[in-house]
Amino acid sequence: MDRVFIEELTVFAQIGVYDWEQQIKQKLVFDLEMAWDCKQAAETDDVVYCLNYAEVSQAIIDYVESKPFLLIERVAYEVADLLESRYQLQGLKIKLSKPKAVAQARNVGVLIVRGCLK
């Protein structure tokens, strides 16, 4: 299966379990792989047959910025549900990072894998 990817999509979200975290916007970084059959787009050179990564990116940004979250796990699962339902993906991999969440670590996060990308 072909894959469409988006790397380092940055979103600023109201996220965290501490009271002070809910008062600020924090950086979240998405890396995505989406199973998508690119054959028809390649054969026709017609954008109507491709997975529009600009549209996918905006859908993620709009959703994550629309409400507060406590956990990145919830963000990752809800974004996965959104993308699967909106774009009928065969598989999906989301790496969601919350940089600087742990002072001694460069990065922390979750990796969600669904469908044929397992």
UniProtKB/Swiss-Prot annotation:
Signal peptide: none annotated. Its EC number is 4.1.2.25, 5.1.99.8. The active site is at K98 (proton donor/acceptor). SMART domains: FolB. It catalyses: 7,8-dihydroneopterin = 6-hydroxymethyl-7,8-dihydropterin + glycolaldehyde; 7,8-dihydroneopterin = 7,8-dihydromonapterin. The keyword Transcription does not apply. PANTHER family: DIHYDRONEOPTERIN ALDOLASE 1-RELATED. Belongs to the DHNA family. Catalyzes the conversion of 7,8-dihydroneopterin to 6-hydroxymethyl-7,8-dihydropterin. Can use L-threo-dihydroneopterin and D-erythro-dihydroneopterin as substrates for the formation of 6-hydroxymethyldihydropterin, but it can also catalyze the epimerization of carbon 2' of dihydroneopterin to dihydromonapterin. This is Dihydroneopterin aldolase. It comes from Haemophilus influenzae (strain ATCC 51907 / DSM 11121 / KW20 / Rd).
